[in-house]
Amino acid sequence: MAKKVINVVKLQIPAGAATPAPPVGPALGQAGINIVGFTKDFNARTADQKGMIIPVVITVYEDRSFDFVTKTPPAPVLLKQAAGIQKASGEPNKNKVGSVTTAQVKEIAETKMKDLNAASIEAAMRMVEGTARSMGIEVKD
């Protein structure tokens, strides 16, 4: 018989750097999860992606056990890394803060494909290009 789900917690945590300190500790403590066990598992699973923000969905069961699924880093994080910028533009229509090539957009779209609601790589690329535009990043050929 399947275990009964009592809670689902969604967090964005730096890869390989989960600690029991806020915001991770309190969110997991409220759900009744073994915080140290989760942080060790998460850090081991994401050690190869250091420096990236990793979204994670934690499913908590009735017996206080848990499973978690890591997702791909958010598109804005990947775009900022590709463009070599720290912060997106506050006025994306007026101030362009960086640029990415179509090849970089395609690479990001391929990375994000499993988490995006897109039927083709072209549709995923359009989503990533839209995110880039809203951040003040130009897409060049």
UniProtKB/Swiss-Prot annotation:
GO BP annotations listed: translation
Alphabetized Pfam families for the sequence: Ribosomal_L11, Ribosomal_L11_N
PTM per Swiss-Prot/TrEMBL: One or more lysine residues are methylated.
Cellular component, GO, one term: cytosolic large ribosomal subunit
Top-level taxonomic group: Bacteria
Annotated keywords: Methylation, Ribonucleoprotein, Ribosomal protein, RNA-binding, rRNA-binding
Molecular function (Gene Ontology), one example: large ribosomal subunit rRNA binding
Gene3D superfamilies: Ribosomal protein L11, C-terminal domain, Ribosomal protein L11/L12, N-terminal domain
SMART domains: RL11
Function: Forms part of the ribosomal stalk which helps the ribosome interact with GTP-bound translation factors.
Family per similarity comment: Belongs to the universal ribosomal protein uL11 family.
Binding partners and assembly: Part of the ribosomal stalk of the 50S ribosomal subunit. Interacts with L10 and the large rRNA to form the base of the stalk. L10 forms an elongated spine to which L12 dimers bind in a sequential fashion forming a multimeric L10(L12)X complex.
PANTHER family according to UniProt: 60S RIBOSOMAL PROTEIN L12, LARGE RIBOSOMAL SUBUNIT PROTEIN UL11M
Name assigned to this protein: Large ribosomal subunit protein uL11
Originating organism: Lactobacillus delbrueckii subsp. bulgaricus (strain ATCC 11842 / DSM 20081 / BCRC 10696 / JCM 1002 / NBRC 13953 / NCIMB 11778 / NCTC 12712 / WDCM 00102 / Lb 14)
